[in-house]
Amino acid sequence: MRNAHAPVDVAMIGFGAIGAAVYRAVEHDAALRVAHVIVPEHQCDAVRGALGERVDVVSSVDALAYRPQFALECAGHGALVDHVVPLLRAGTDCAVASIGALSDLALLDALSEAADEGGATLTLLSGAIGGVDALAAAKQGGLDEVQYIGRKPPLGWLGTPAEALCDLRAMTAEQTIFEGSARDAARLYPKNANVAATVALAGVGLDATKVRLIADPAVTRNVHRVVARGAFGEMSIEMSGKPLPDNPKTSALTAFSAIRALRNRASHCVI
């Protein structure tokens, strides 16, 4: 059992926009101690320079000086295989932000098996969407339908299959660029899949969750809408998210959900 007065020993996986924002938020929190950061080898020197000697910066789980109590992943899909699986297997509880990767059943199974083997818990962060707790609760009574609608400015879809469907730089009216299952959305739009996958895993699953993605020149932010109905009644939630100040491509709420996960881990009263 953890000493009630000792800070939770944390390893952070990734130190990009989200990781840096999380670190700044908890750096002086007496209940938490970010003692380790895992990043790719080519980033180690830069991160060491930013954090100094108080944090052990390494490129692999094997290089950790000891096993941390808790790990937070905010590094991208590849980190789940390389770092989260071995940490779970070693008995470290982990919270992950890269939910879109879990549309890969083999990866989801590998994470679940590693957690079972290590007696650890894998927590999926709610990220950029709210209402996940209500959706997961509603699932207990039975859900009839869940739909996720994601709406972004046209230029937010650059580098995706949407470029073959319309001229994203010259749009004057909204256009649906994808309609199908959450699993197919994750496959075709992997960099935009985290919210759809989170909604799906909390509700009726990746194949039954309906997804609609829209390029809309009338919006200036990413807009997420979830509609569900079931034995509980009906729900509809819409969020228009702001990005992190230093990274316009990253949802601020995603970073806040990671901060909340760390503080919940250290708290004796959690909501």
UniProtKB/Swiss-Prot annotation:
Keywords: NAD, NADP, Oxidoreductase, Pyridine nucleotide biosynthesis. Pathway: Cofactor biosynthesis; NAD(+) biosynthesis; iminoaspartate from L-aspartate (dehydrogenase route): step 1/1. GO terms for molecular function: aspartate dehydrogenase activity; NAD binding; NADP binding; oxidoreductase activity, acting on the CH-NH2 group of donors, NAD or NADP as acceptor. It holds the Pfam family Asp_DH_C. It catalyses: L-aspartate + NADP(+) + H2O = oxaloacetate + NH4(+) + NADPH + H(+); L-aspartate + NAD(+) + H2O = oxaloacetate + NH4(+) + NADH + H(+). Its EC number is 1.4.1.21. The keyword NADP applies. The active site is at residue 224. Gene3D superfamilies: Dihydrodipicolinate Reductase, domain 2 (3.30.360.10), NAD(P)-binding Rossmann-like Domain (3.40.50.720). InterPro entries: Asp/hSer_DH_NAD-bd, Asp_DH, Asp_DH_prok, L-Asp_DH, NAD(P)-bd_dom_sf. It is an enzyme of class 1 (oxidoreductase). Belongs to the L-aspartate dehydrogenase family. PANTHER family: ASPARTATE DEHYDROGENASE DOMAIN-CONTAINING PROTEIN (PTHR31873:SF6), L-ASPARTATE DEHYDROGENASE-RELATED (PTHR31873). The iminoaspartate product is unstable in aqueous solution and can decompose to oxaloacetate and ammonia. NCBIfam families: PRK13303.1-1 (NF009826), PRK13303.1-2 (NF009827), PRK13303.1-3 (NF009828). This is L-aspartate dehydrogenase. The lineage of its organism: Bacteria, Pseudomonadati, Pseudomonadota, Betaproteobacteria, Burkholderiales.
